[in-house]
């Protein structure tokens, strides 16, 4: 099996075990355990029997399922941890809900849009490699991406917090209509909980670094997107600033380890 497949398999085993070690309600435990067992079987089957094309793209399915399944671990927010995270936001930005009110509407619209479409960067990075004849780098790419994203999801079993938008007054931003639309998508199409470190930042940085050594121009574009998402996390109140910094550190660390030990 590829290293990326092992990462996914071990993560689903982790979910199946940790849900019984935390006070998760029984129906959720059943869902987490059952879906995790199915995914372990799927990963093994794909690794052994699926065509190379399917195997190359399957990690995007694994990480997507893992994201929503991890959300089932959420029990109750740690208000003490939330207060600590907010303290740093207020120390650095004053009142972050009004700090960016004077930023131009086009910039706010761009940040909201790139944040909302973050999930497209994961297959987008591999598509850039595959379409330029570098599909052989699938395992290297997905090892970085899965390790970064799942590494951000895993601590949710312990560090349980709500995103800033769930506990603050609405942010005052110039592009209010688009921000309301982006907020609606975030509230209704995501798990609605906060990941510490930020999965958005960790994984998009991994996407960029997974592409840049082979396709420098494309990698720079993805790097700009990753930086924009990091800024958008704080401006749109989707993440705390500490989440963003921790996510960047995680993404860099994962990519450094992958480069050092190979994939």
PLM region spans:
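Terminal transmembrane helix and immediately flanking juxtamembrane interfaces
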Residues: 1-191, 205, 209-224, 228-231, ...
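Membrane-interface micro-motifs in multi-pass membrane enzymes
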Residues: 192-203
């Amino acid at each position: 099996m590829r290293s990326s497949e092992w990462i996914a398999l071990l993560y689903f085993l982790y979910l199946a075990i940790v849900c019984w070690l935390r006070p998760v309600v029984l129906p959720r435990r059943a869902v987490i355990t059952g879906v995790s067992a199915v995914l372990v079987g799927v990963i093994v089957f794909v690794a052994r029997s699926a065509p190379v094309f399917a195997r190359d793209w399957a990690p995007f399915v694994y990480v997507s399922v893992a994201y929503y399944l991890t959300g089932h671990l959420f029990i109750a927010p740690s208000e003490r941890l939330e207060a600590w995270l907010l303290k740093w936001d207020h120390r650095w930005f004053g009142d972050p809900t009004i700090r960016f009110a004077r930023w131009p509407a086009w910039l706010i619209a761009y940040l909201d849009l790139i944040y909302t479409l973050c999930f497209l960067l994961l297959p987008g990075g591999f598509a850039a490699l595959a379409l330029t004849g570098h599909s052989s780098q699938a395992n290297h790419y997905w090892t970085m991406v899965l390790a970064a994203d799942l590494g951000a999801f895993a601590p949710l079993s312990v560090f349980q917090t709500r995103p800033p938008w769930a506990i603050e007054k609405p942010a005052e931003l110039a592009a209010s209509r688009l921000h309301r639309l982006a907020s609606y998508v975030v509230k209704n199409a995501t798990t609605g909980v906060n990941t510490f470190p930020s999965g958005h930042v960790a994984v998009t940085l991994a996407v960029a670094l997974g592409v840049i050594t082979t396709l420098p121009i494309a990698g720079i574009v993805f790097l700009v997107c990753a930086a924009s998402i990091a800024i958008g996390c704080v401006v749109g109140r989707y993440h705390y600033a500490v989440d963003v910094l921790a996510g960047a550190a995680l993404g860099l660390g994962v990519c450094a380890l992958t480069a050092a030990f190979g994939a």
